[in-house]
């Protein structure tokens, strides 16, 4: 009861919860923890039951990008209580380096799926954003959802970015990532 009261009294508290797929096997495979999907869903509903603000964080990778449209529909039907939905580009550090061939995908290669998912959620009046994907890698229909999101201490811009008309709005690139998209170009 004490922790419940603490959460209820904290109007500035936002829970950022990763959800990797609408399909439990995919979610568990990505987290490498059997049962993590079920635990995540229980946690989401528990937080919702006490009125907590929830941000769903969907880190896009090679293992989940094809189901982004289905995931958006799942969120709309089953998780309408979430305050924010954030689609996030993958930072190529930590476990993603070890599993690079399994998880890394050039953002240019999942634009169709991302566009469908984001547009669906926006049309259904859910608050949706895109983080950590340079604007030049997005379809123009997605520009308005892109956030300048990479922390100052780990953002970088390559030479091509200096000529870009959208640089002041763009999240840039992770200086910590070992690989960048070859499709980065000025707009």
Language-model features: locations:
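Short, surface-exposed linear patches
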Residues: 14-15, 37-41, 77-78, 107-110, ...
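A C-terminal junction/extension of Radical SAM enzymes
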Residues: 67, 84, 90-162, 167-169
């Amino acid at each position: 009861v004490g922790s419940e009261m603490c959460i209820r009294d904290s109007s500035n508290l936002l829970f950022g919860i990763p959800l990797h797929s609408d399909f439990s096997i995919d979610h568990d495979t990505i987290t490498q923890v059997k049962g993590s999907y079920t635990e995540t869903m229980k946690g989401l509903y528990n937080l919702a039951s006490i009125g907590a603000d929830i941000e769903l964080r969907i880190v896009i990778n090679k293992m989940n990008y094809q189901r982004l449209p289905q995931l958006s529909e799942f969120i709309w039907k089953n998780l309408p209580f979430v305050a924010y939905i954030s689609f996030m580009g993958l930072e190529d550090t930590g476990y993603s380096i070890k599993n690079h061939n399994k998880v890394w995908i050039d953002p240019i290669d999942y634009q169709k799926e991302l566009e469908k998912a984001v547009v669906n959620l926006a049309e259904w009046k859910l608050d949706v954003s895109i983080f950590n994907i340079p604007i030049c890698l997005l379809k123009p229909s997605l520009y308005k959802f892109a956030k300048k999101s990479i922390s100052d201490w780990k953002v970088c811009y390559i030479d091509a970015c200096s000529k870009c008309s959208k640089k002041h709005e763009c999240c840039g690139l992770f200086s910590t990532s070992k690989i960048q998209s070859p499709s980065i170009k000025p707009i």
